[in-house]
Amino acid sequence: MAAELTTAGYIGHHLAFLKTGDSFWHVHLDTLLFSIISGAIFLFVFSKVAKKATPGVPSKMQCFVEIMVDWIDGIVKENFHGPRHAVGPLALTIFCWVFIMNAIDLIPVDFLPQLAHLFGIEYLRAVPTADISGTLGLSIGVFFLIIFYTIKSKGMSGFVKEYTLHPFNHPLLIPVNLALESVTLLAKPVSLAFRLFGNMYAGELIFILIAVMYMANNFALNSMGIFMHLAWAIFHILVITLQAFIFMMLTVVYLSMGYNKAEH
């Protein structure tokens, strides 16, 4: 029983947030901190490369950044049929930012919490995208961008028509249209948030469960834990990249749908 409680306590400790209080309106400080750090890493790397960019023989980092920019720009050109001067940088930022936040999950699960413990911090969850409040924050930003691009494309009157006269073009059915279209609109940010959160939370939990194997006084279990940790980390590289790509891709597609939606 003691071992079970110890295991349960270990898992619970790693799933607890560093927060401002116990009320409903508390803030997850660790999610906020690592989100800012991830964004700062992206800005630092790309701004440094941009300042040192040369038309001559490029450095390896410049080649990497140029490949990333060209790749994202190609995706935006194929999927967003409107002015791309803001959507391209937005897509690049989303992909890199989400990828860096996801990649924090590859750090050994005990390293950052133990480091924080040295400074008197009891709880710390380092993966912002494994926190539903973090992914909802990202998706709410996308939600407002969808509304912005719809209004920019159709005007306020066109925006109202989209959600009151579709799919049934009759004044008496405006409440039905509004209900249907509102659900469709709200489903976009909700699905974005929960898809990213679900995958990253599951990945984080698997790492924690594998780490529990190291607590056993059994050489076979410890050895199996090392093998499983390495195997899952290699597979998880694909997961974190794919989830960043899906979030970025769906954002571009949703913005394109809002911008190019046909009049009814």
UniProtKB/Swiss-Prot annotation:
Lineage top rank: taxon: Bacteria
PROSITE patterns named in the record: ATPASE_A
Membrane topology: Multi-pass membrane protein
Gene Ontology cellular-component annotations: plasma membrane; proton-transporting ATP synthase complex
Gene Ontology terms for molecular function: proton-transporting ATP synthase activity, rotational mechanism
Gene Ontology biological process terms, A to Z: proton motive force-driven plasma membrane ATP synthesis
Keywords: ATP synthesis, Cell inner membrane, Cell membrane, CF(0), Hydrogen ion transport, Ion transport, Membrane, Transmembrane, Transmembrane helix, Transport
Leader sequence residues: none
Locations listed in the record: Cell inner membrane
InterPro entries membership: ATP_syn_F0_a_bact/chloroplast, ATP_synth_F0_asu, ATP_synth_F0_asu_AS, F0_ATP_A_sf
Transmembrane segments: 27-47, 87-107, 131-151, 172-192, 196-216, 230-250
Record's function text: Key component of the proton channel; it plays a direct role in the translocation of protons across the membrane.
Subunit structure: F-type ATPases have 2 components, CF(1) - the catalytic core - and CF(0) - the membrane proton channel. CF(1) has five subunits: alpha(3), beta(3), gamma(1), delta(1), epsilon(1). CF(0) has three main subunits: a(1), b(2) and c(9-12). The alpha and beta chains form an alternating ring which encloses part of the gamma chain. CF(1) is attached to CF(0) by a central stalk formed by the gamma and epsilon chains, while a peripheral stalk is formed by the delta and b chains.
Similarity remark: Belongs to the ATPase A chain family.
Protein name: ATP synthase subunit a
Organism: Pasteurella multocida (strain Pm70)
